[in-house]
């Protein structure tokens, strides 16, 4: 799916890691997306504090205090590497991104680096696996000493050749490992917006992905409105959550894979509360393959957005956190 007022100064990534927080939750991971640095996608590069913002470490700390232990941090490739995927960094943007990652991992939680690009760079489908490998080799090299960083290959590939989606994911894996980042998990995403409900029909070929470190996690997204887009506060039924992840659960089991729901949400209403609770209960019954889930989304600039998980007054933080609490650490 689809913000701090001062520029954050980054610490070195290697110095910003603590031991993973101990979990009382049934899941290995449970947390939230942290949105803002990908805002203003129609204004590139845009200005910090005007078109985009970075997540606020203080509100992330509040969510950690509630028991969350994983945060998916959105950013745009075009802002990080403005000239080309293989080019030099915008050092200020990298510093801000690194600061957020450091704040998360110093607290013992996991930070997912999420290039929120939909398989595209400057509006064009990424077609060069070599360039994509280099992008990831360069970025992973910045965080290779921080084992609480997770690399998400790209957000929600869509309307792309299926073999290309496979090859881009494999190129990212190869680049990350070539950088010497060998301890971190890699989250791979699929075509058709990485939807769990379409995964079996669309993304079966991704079972061929390989990783010498055997730390691939299949990241799927699932919304509960009629078209699965997450653009409505309504949910189709009280049982739609479980129904939309059942086939993907079987696929994970049949293929010896593990997965995570990288985005989910529903409106603050009784039907969605029941549907989300049912989905999470089902995932919790299948933790051999489901390692957790992340709400969409927190972030400083969401305002009155229907799924806003930003403390202290976001609609979902106020109206949905209680149904997530059984799964928090």
From Swiss-Prot:
The subcellular location is: Secreted
Specify the glycosylation sites in chain numbering. Answer: 33, 96
Q: Please give the function described in this protein's UniProt entry.
A: Has endoglucanase activity on substrates containing beta-1,4 glycosidic bonds, like in carboxymethylcellulose (CMC), hydroxyethylcellulose (HEC) and beta-glucan. Involved in the degradation of complex natural cellulosic substrates.
Q: Which reaction does it catalyse?
A: Endohydrolysis of (1->4)-beta-D-glucosidic linkages in cellulose, lichenin and cereal beta-D-glucans
Q: Which branch of life, at top level?
A: Eukaryota
Q: Where mainly located?
A: secreted
Which residues lie in coiled coils? none
Is the Lyase keyword given for this protein?
no
Span-the-membrane segments of this chain are none
For the protein in the UniProt heading, the enzyme class is: hydrolase
- EC number of the protein: 3.2.1.4
The UniProt entry's GO biological process terms, in alphabetical order, are:
cellulose catabolic process
* GO MF term list: cellulase activity
Q: Name the UniProt key words of this record, in alphabetical order.
A: Carbohydrate metabolism, Cellulose degradation, Glycoprotein, Glycosidase, Hydrolase, Polysaccharide degradation, Secreted, Signal
**Which InterPro entries does the annotation name?**
Glyco_hydro_5, Glycoside_hydrolase_SF
What is the name listed in the Swiss-Prot or TrEMBL entry for this protein? Probable endo-beta-1,4-glucanase B
Active site feature: 156 (proton donor), 263 (nucleophile)
- Give the family this protein belongs to, as stated in its UniProt record: Belongs to the glycosyl hydrolase 5 (cellulase A) family.
Cellular component terms (Gene Ontology): extracellular region
- What Pfam families does its record include? Cellulase (PF00150)
Q: Where is the signal peptide?
A: 1-18
């Amino acid at each position: 799916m689809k913000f701090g007022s001062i520029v954050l100064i980054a610490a070195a990534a290697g110095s910003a890691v603590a031991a993973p927080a101990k979990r009382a939750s049934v899941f290995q991971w449970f947390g939230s997306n942290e949105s803002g640095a990908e805002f203003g996608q129609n204004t590139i590069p845009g200005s910090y504090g005007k078109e985009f913002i970075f997540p606020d470490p203080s509100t992330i700390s509040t969510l950690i205090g509630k028991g969350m232990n994983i945060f998916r941090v959105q950013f745009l490739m075009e802002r990080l590497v403005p000239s080309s995927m293989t080019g030099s960094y915008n050092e200020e943007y990298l510093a801000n991104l690194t600061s957020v990652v450091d704040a998360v991992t110093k607290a013992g939680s996991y930070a997912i680096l999420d290039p929120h690009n939909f398989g595209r760079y400057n509006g064009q489908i990424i077609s060069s696996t070599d360039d994509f490998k280099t992008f990831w080799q360069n970025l992973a090299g910045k965080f290779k000493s921080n084992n609480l960083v997770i690399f998400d290959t790209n957000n929600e590939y869509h309307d792309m050749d299926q073999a290309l989606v496979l090859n881009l994911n494999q190129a990212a894996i190869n680049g990350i490992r070539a950088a010497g980042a060998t301890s971190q998990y890699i989250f791979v995403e699929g075509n058709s917006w990485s939807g769990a409900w379409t995964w079996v029909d669309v993304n079966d070929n991704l079972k061929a992905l390989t990783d010498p470190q055997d730390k691939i996690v299949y990241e799927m997204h699932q919304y509960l409105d009629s078209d699965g887009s997450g653009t409505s506060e309504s949910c189709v039924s009280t049982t739609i959550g479980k129904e939309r992840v059942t086939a993907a659960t079987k696929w994970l089991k049949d293929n010896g894979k593990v997965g995570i729901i990288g985005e989910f949400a529903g409106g603050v209403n009784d039907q969605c509360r029941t549907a989300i609770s049912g989905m999470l209960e089902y995932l919790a019954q299948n933790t051999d393959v489901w390692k957790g889930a992340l709400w969409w989304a927190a972030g400083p600039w969401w305002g009155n957005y229907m799924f806003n998980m930003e403390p202290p007054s976001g609609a979902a933080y106020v109206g949905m956190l209680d149904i997530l609490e059984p799964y928090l650490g």
